[in-house]
Amino acid sequence: MPKINKYTDISEIDREAKKDYIDRHSPFITCANTATANEPFEVTVTMGNEYTHPDDFDHYIESITLFDGETKLAQATYIPGTLGNIKAHNTTKFTIIPTGKKLKLVAHGYCTKHGIWESTAVEVEVN
């Protein structure tokens, strides 16, 4: 089983290089706090908040996966050069249809050099 790296609040870290490493590999979820059952709901996942990630042929974000708890909802895959071979924030918009009473959204980003990185969970109330 591969190791899953988890986001650490970079404001609590002293070394700039470590802040950069953690932030640029971490997925960040942006969405509304509430959703309507059986209606489209948009979720944006951005790799990195303050720092950008490389897009080199051997070091890039290969995929971003969105989960509701342990249920895989969606996945986007990328090839090297998708972001023009420059450092950037890989941003993916997913549209899902919530059916339960609550969502517990978690995203995974996969870096070809540094493995799987997991976001902080985001809870969404479904009406």
Which role fits each region the language model picked out?
Residues 46-56:
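Short amphipathic, basic-aromatic surface patches that mediate peripheral association
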Residues 84-93:
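Aromatic sugar-binding surface patches on proteins
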Residues 4-36:
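Short, compositionally biased P/S/T/A/G/V-rich stretches that sit at domain boundaries
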Residues 40, 100-106:
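Extracellular Ig-like/FN3 beta-sandwich strand-entry sites
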Residues 110-120:
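Short acidic/polar inter-strand loop motif in beta-rich domains
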Residues 58-74:
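Extended low-complexity, serine/threonine- and proline-enriched intrinsically disordered segments
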Residues 73-84:
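Solvent-exposed serine/threonine-rich low-complexity stretches and specific carbohydrate-binding patches
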